[in-house]
Amino acid sequence: MSAQKPGLHPRNRHHSRYDLATLCQVNPELRQFLTLTPAGEQSVDFANPLAVKALNKALLAHFYAVANWDIPDGFLCPPVPGRADYIHHLADLLAEATGSIPANASILDIGVGANCIYPLIGVHEYGWRFTGSETSSQALSSAQAIISANPGLNRAIRLRRQKESGAIFNGIIHKNEQYDATLCNPPFHDSAAAARAGSERKRRNLGLNKDDVLNFGGQQQELWCEGGEVAFIKKMIEESKGFAKQVMWFTSLVSRGENLPPLYRALTDVGAVKVVKKEMAQGQKQSRFIAWTFMNDEQRRRFVNRQR
């Protein structure tokens, strides 16, 4: 297993502080959500879900050419810089086979969400093609609306409904399909109560009372599942063995470092040939993803070159 030291990825477009004047020009509705910090600096009211949504609209339009983006109330509104970091580190992982980032990689996003965030960034930054899976018909409808509202995305992103309860890859990866990588931001809580407690902690950290709005939205399938993150990723690992020749790299975010040991044991049990951990950091937030493959170095080189 190899690891990388944390830090915002060099190719991430969000190293600098937000240029709020420019972002307000891109999306004028953002202006109403600007606040002043105790130091007298302009900022965004991150505790307000409407403010975070307005900021995301501006960021996606300004940096990623997504002119039309929206999500229904109650769905996760993702922090764009952190999502971009996953995409850039994934690009580096794909580049290790041949020394260059593949321009026409095919990526499977497990749980694409109503926001469709990973495909939007990946298509713009690297020209990749995406398949996004979802269990929620409402989330799929939202993601499809985003795709249809922005020219060119229909050719780059396709969506599939996961109809099989508890399945992850089964029913989504079709016979004879090949993917350079899968990615996933798994539900991390193990119950609805734990998800609510997590939201309450964030509320307290922001100094909010129980009546204040909160930007940490999320539907059940986005926030929790039976057994939590470890159980979900273990299921993913178990199913991945059946697609060992169709997918070069399987990857997933892991929210807590203490969840890694049981996942490493599961990867040993299924016979993963190589396992990689990539550490990431966005401000005070530390995150990571693990990646595993059933292909050796030569097999991965051949896989990458199959359509080149």
Curated annotation (Swiss-Prot):
Main location: cytoplasm
Gene Ontology cellular-component annotations: cytoplasm
InterPro entries: METTL16/RlmF, rRNA_lsu_MeTfrase_F, SAM-dependent_MTases_sf
GO MF annotation terms: 23S rRNA (adenine(1618)-N(6))-methyltransferase activity
Entry's EC annotation: 2.1.1.181
UniProt keyword list: Cytoplasm, Methyltransferase, rRNA processing, S-adenosyl-L-methionine, Transferase
Keyword NAD: no
Subcellular location per the Swiss-Prot or TrEMBL entry: Cytoplasm
Catalysis: reaction(s): adenosine(1618) in 23S rRNA + S-adenosyl-L-methionine = N(6)-methyladenosine(1618) in 23S rRNA + S-adenosyl-L-homocysteine + H(+)
Endoplasmic reticulum keyword on record: no
UniProt-listed GO biological process terms: rRNA base methylation
Enzyme class: transferase
Extent of the signal sequence: none
Matches recorded under Pfam families: Methyltransf_10
Function summary: Specifically methylates the adenine in position 1618 of 23S rRNA.
Family matches, as PANTHER family: RNA N6-ADENOSINE-METHYLTRANSFERASE METTL16, SAM-DEPENDENT METHYLTRANSFERASE
NCBIfam families noted in UniProt: PRK11727.1
Family according to the record: Belongs to the methyltransferase superfamily. METTL16/RlmF family.
Protein name (Swiss-Prot/TrEMBL): Ribosomal RNA large subunit methyltransferase F
Organism listed in the record: Escherichia coli O17:K52:H18 (strain UMN026 / ExPEC)
